[in-house]
Amino acid sequence: MTASILTALLLLAPITPETARFTIRQDGRTIGTEEFTIRSQGKGYVAEGKTQLVGDPTPLSCRMELDENLNPTSYEYTHGLGTIRIKIETPTSQMTVGGGGSESSTEFRFPSGASIIDNNFFHHYLLLLYRVKGADQKFPIFVPQDMQAGQARVRSTGTRTYDLEVGDVKLEATVDSAGRLTRLTVPAAKVVVER
């Protein structure tokens, strides 16, 4: 079965609701974990994640609501007292950033059709891979913690394997027969994320 046919078949299957845990390693040492849940809500989905990094007593948390096409409609990130909340609408979206008792809001144009790929939340790559419909695709992305838009390129490299380029970062992903992310590596940083 060719990679493009397998990719198409994976897309025809519904998103797999799941609760799972990734272990994050760098240079062979465990540097953190991420627990996440993806569940159906109405016609869309809710994805929630919590990442605990070694040396940081405060976990990072996020919650994303997505429509039936996996387009984000809202996003919330928290780390201690710091928060980022995004309400995605057309033509203008709203971002509210809080921390230390103060809060500021700004309107901005969320890139049309973009995926959210935030720092230290690896289940966001799983959601991106669920959107793949061909052997080589480009997707607009938005990184809330960096407040930057960019582009991700996803290329199928074989049965259930992908190369990803997110800005300057190159990653390799492996999914199982249900399309669930099982391993993500960032070779240049010697980072391996796996179930």
Where are these regions (language model features)?
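Sec-dependent N-terminal signal peptides
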Residues: 2-12
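N-terminal helix-cap/turn-to-beta initiation motif at the start of protein domains
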Residues: 12-17, 39, 155-158
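Short, small/polar residue-rich loop motifs at catalytic or cofactor-binding pockets
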Residues: 17-18, 59-60, 167-169
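N-terminal mature ectodomain segment of secretory-pathway/periplasmic proteins
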Residues: 24-98, 179
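Solvent-exposed helix/loop surface patches that form functional interfaces
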Residues: 76-168, 178, 185
